Amino acid sequence: MSGGKGKGGKGKGGKGKGGKASAAVEGAQQSHSSRAGLQFPVGRIKRYMKKSVQNKVRVGAKAAIYIAAVLEYLTAEVLELAGNAARDLKVKRITPRHLQLAIRGDEELDTLIQATIAYGGVMPHINKALLLKVEQHKKK
């Protein structure tokens, strides 16, 4: 018979039946986000999901992780494009205008995010018919 410390027979330390060696301090708590390798708060998203769904509907743990991962990816994508827009305009701070330029400049994000961005301005656009008239005047 083993040492009598549960199914694994090894107690709390070392490599138990789970297959992972305990490298961290014993009993150290790890957040859902750090376990999933995310920055967005998985626990908070799960709490919001549980609060907003109908009664007697269960929310799986992986659902909150998936939503957090999608939100983190979309946020990183928008911030990267907005940072590029800010850098093109030679400024160091991302403003709502840069967010507007980034979202409306990307076709997929434009269809996904159809909200009006406050202080975002409008997209620069000149009709091609007007451009042709200007070019014809220059040729004369």
UniProtKB/Swiss-Prot annotation:
**What gene does the UniProt entry assign to this protein?**
HTZ1
* Modification note: Acetylated once deposited into chromatin.
Functionally, this protein is described as follows: Variant histone H2A which can replace H2A in some nucleosomes. Nucleosomes wrap and compact DNA into chromatin, limiting DNA accessibility to the cellular machineries which require DNA as a template. Histones thereby play a central role in transcription regulation, DNA repair, DNA replication and chromosomal stability. DNA accessibility is regulated via a complex set of post-translational modifications of histones, also called histone code, and nucleosome remodeling.
Residue ranges annotated as compositionally biased, kind Basic residues, are 7-18
Record-linked Pfam families: Histone, Histone_H2A_C
**Residues annotated with N6-acetyllysine modification:** K5, K10, K12
Q: Where is this region: Disordered?
A: 1-38
Disulphide-bonded residues? none
Q: What is the annotated localization of this protein?
A: Nucleus; Chromosome
Q: Which family does it belong to?
A: Belongs to the histone H2A family.
State what protein this is by name: Histone H2A.Z
What molecular function does GO assign, one term? protein heterodimerization activity
What's the main place this protein lives? nucleus
Gene Ontology terms: biological process: CENP-A eviction from euchromatin; heterochromatin formation
Query: What does the subunit section of this Swiss-Prot or TrEMBL entry state?
Result: The nucleosome is a histone octamer containing two molecules each of H2A, H2B, H3 and H4 assembled in one H3-H4 heterotetramer and two H2A-H2B heterodimers. The octamer wraps approximately 147 bp of DNA. H2A or its variant H2A.Z forms a heterodimer with H2B. H2A.Z associates with the VPS72/SWC2 subunit of the SWR1 chromatin remodeling complex. Also interacts with RBP1/DNA-directed RNA polymerase II largest subunit.
Query: Keywords for this entry?
Result: Acetylation, Activator, Chromatin regulator, Chromosome, DNA-binding, Nucleosome core, Nucleus, Transcription, Transcription regulation
Give a Gene Ontology cellular component term annotated to this protein: nucleosome
